[in-house]
Amino acid sequence: MAKTVVLVVAAGRGRRFGGDLPKQYHDLAGRMVLRHTLAAFATNPEIGAVRAVIHPDDRQLYDMAAAGLNLLEPVHGGATRQDSVRLGLDSLKDLNPDKVLIHDGARPFIDHGTIGRVIRALDRHPGALPVVPVADTLKRGQDGFVADTVDRANLFRAQTPQGFRYAEIVAAHHAVIGNELTDDAAVAEKAGLAVELVNGAEDNVKITTGADLERARCLFDGPGEVRSASGYDVHRFDPAKDACWLCGVPVPHEAGLLGHSDADVGLHALTDAVLGAISAGDIGHHFPPTDARWKGAASDQFLAHAGSLVTAKGGRIVNVDVTIICERPKVGPHRAAMAARVAEILGISQDRVSVKATTTEGLGFTGRKEGIAAQAMASVWLPR
């Protein structure tokens, strides 16, 4: 049983945002908004499982946003957010978690500190709500004029994730079917559940309009630094195989590559580059060739792991570049597919991925067609 499960609500159409593309699937610093949100929970060690609630028409977009993350199968939402949450909660019945956190898919800046405060509050009370105090002076208007000033003491802006003991919030949601309530804390209030206020975070903003998205992009461009690192790998040919795995794509050839895993020289070099950019060792440290678990393993999981470590540090991948060095096979016909696959594994847009090929003009082991080499570069943005 997963003790704490997260339900990410991402079934909305974003009518206030405008346009045909729902806001949660817009680009934010090279990744979809929803990707940032899902990754924040999927990489948190306090979370046992993550499930998204999506619109039936958005499955292809969702799969792009969720690629490479360890998530539960998504479920479809309903006509309203409240309906979507209830359907999502019901889908967790077999997991029967102790606690559930309900989060807006369009809040990509959720931090581990807020998540932890919500989880710990549920040890004390059946509900927990992250909030930030209202700082602006509040005015009540009437007929276009100021009627009076509202006392802002004890007034807060509610955020998500809103946390609850699972059994109690499920019962509360079923008890208010037909009532239109603004958030899950209101559902809990209606059921008489005590909801503790915990400190939220000013940056944990919800993207509702196009202007919100622009402000979110400014947040991503805030204090931080870009780090770059390189990676290099070599594998000899194995005549017992009839294809080479290169950057996640099988390339037909008279020989494959010899290695403990699938010997994907491109992904191995790139994994080392990403790990190097965050000073996290090398591929052999995380996936030692002496470990039988990685015998014949697909190398996409190595790169996905490196990407998840970047996310866990609050960072993002800016761009990656791979150069494959060989006489044969020809890389050109497969280059676009390789770039697309790398982008999918890392959850970044394809215009942040470069895959190139060159030869050594007949010199050295690659010139003698004994194997393939690859070198890679990765640039990563990390908060200060």
UniProtKB/Swiss-Prot annotation:
In the N-terminal section; belongs to the IspD/TarI cytidylyltransferase family. IspD subfamily. One of its GO terms (biological process) is isopentenyl diphosphate biosynthetic process, methylerythritol 4-phosphate pathway. Keywords: Isoprene biosynthesis, Lyase, Metal-binding, Multifunctional enzyme, Nucleotidyltransferase, Transferase. Its cofactor is a divalent metal cation. Coiled coil: none annotated. 4-CDP-2-C-methyl-D-erythritol 2-phosphate binds at D233, V234, H235, H260, S261, D282, I283, G284, T358, T359, T360, E361, F365, R368. The record marks R152, K206 as: Positions MEP for the nucleophilic attack. It catalyses: 2-C-methyl-D-erythritol 4-phosphate + CTP + H(+) = 4-CDP-2-C-methyl-D-erythritol + diphosphate; 4-CDP-2-C-methyl-D-erythritol 2-phosphate = 2-C-methyl-D-erythritol 2,4-cyclic diphosphate + CMP. Residues 227-384 are annotated as: 2-C-methyl-D-erythritol 2,4-cyclodiphosphate synthase. This is Bifunctional enzyme IspD/IspF. Its EC number is 2.7.7.60, 4.6.1.12. Pathway: Isoprenoid biosynthesis; isopentenyl diphosphate biosynthesis via DXP pathway; isopentenyl diphosphate from 1-deoxy-D-xylulose 5-phosphate: step 2/6; Isoprenoid biosynthesis; isopentenyl diphosphate biosynthesis via DXP pathway; isopentenyl diphosphate from 1-deoxy-D-xylulose 5-phosphate: step 4/6. The record marks R16, K23, H260, T359 as: Transition state stabilizer.
